[in-house]
Amino acid sequence: MKNYKVAIIGATGLVGRTFLKVLKERNFPVEKLYLYASANSAGKKIEFNGTEYTVMELKDENIANDIDIALFSAGGGVSLEYAPKFKAKGAVVIDNSSAWRMDKNIPLVVPEANPEALKNHPGIIANPNCSTIQVMPVLKVLQEKYGLKRVIYSTYQAVAGSGQKGLNDLEANLKGESSKGYPHQIAFNTLPHIDVFLDNGYTKEEEKMINETRKILNLPDLKVTAT
């Protein structure tokens, strides 16, 4: 079995640490590990498989030349700037942000639904929104067996998805205090408002699900709505 030199961009964040956890749980054959983060996190120590690694600042001169796989979870702006640079050094980039998802030249992949999209990939591979990922294996089977005419999504997202400010609002509401980040009380409530509202009436997060579903299933005219 081949061993791989792996880089994690955004290594000190929640998703970056989850990358490390999954690599360890699955005994992924990591020969060498590179950890990258912002200047504020550079120098931190992270243990992996009994070895302590020092987090490097993400900048051009620190990009190693021998990386096989680069796992990105550092936001869309970072991915747009640095994914091509890692690719140019020979790495295959797997990006967790929304930066490349709708690029017509970049495959958007859920392995259980469209693994064939990985053939002849250009060196950057996108994975979709978490809400889209979990439903794709089911929709793929339904499409193959019966065909899809329309998809209606209703998703209920955790407050944690809006970050620390959202959690602060939840805690404040539970104490009888007003929200500062949310436009209305979030405790014991559901708000049809995730990310910004667009001109078409959908929110940005809802539109992601619509567009990603069509691309992954290769059904550009599929009727999809999401709330």
Regions from the PLM with identified roles:
Residues 1-186, 218-223:
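N-terminal Rossmann-like NAD(P) cofactor-binding subdomain of oxidoreductases
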Residues 189-227:
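Oxyanion-binding "anion nests"
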